[in-house]
Amino acid sequence: MSTIRRISDVFCQWPSRPIGLIEIIGGSYISIRPEVTYKRLISRLLQRNFAVHSWGYIPNFDHQIQANQAWKQFRLSRKFLEKRVGIIPKSIRLGHSLGCKLHLLSPDGGRNCNGLVAISFNNFKAAQSIPMLKKMSQRLNFQTEFSPSPFETLNLITEHYEQINNLLIKFKNDALDQNNLLLKSLKERHSDKSELMQLMVIISLQ
């Protein structure tokens, strides 16, 4: 396993001669320490000589702000990598659950990557994602929602996300996966090449 370098909130792991770069944003709460949560996945990517940058974060209600933060920190981390090894190809972005949404909301619209791998896309409302929130909102008579909302997110993807190469991975026994809705929004764009892959069993990412 390569040495882990932390640049801002990005955990960077570099082989000596990387052939490419994978930028990972994981799911809610399991991505506070992505270098641990996704250790097995990262190890396999490193074995194939990919540099891996994984963003550590604590989710909040403003997903657009977090998407912007991740994008800026990935850009900074890439600059450090290229100072060491020279120019490398555009990255492949990999998202898991909420991480898919954050990549899709990236302020560059996906233009500065070669594609996105979206594993188990999750775009539920706040009350569905946080059961305790639903109980509190009913008891205290208030409403709160993620920004952008699920409906707004799909519209933003259709109107502003420009990357045509997207691989959506759906696990057959995952009741929370919403990749079918994501694929529908992606396919509404001109020249889209997105594909959905359905797997029978959940592969451990740890």
Regions flagged by a language model, labelled:
Residues F61-P89:
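Alpha/beta-hydrolase active-site loop
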Residues S28-S31, N60-F61, G99, N123-A126, ...:
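Short acidic, S/G/P-rich loop/turn micro-motifs used as interaction or catalytic elements
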Residues Q13-S16, G115, K125-L196:
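The feature captures the conserved acid-bearing segment of alpha/beta-hydrolase catalytic domains
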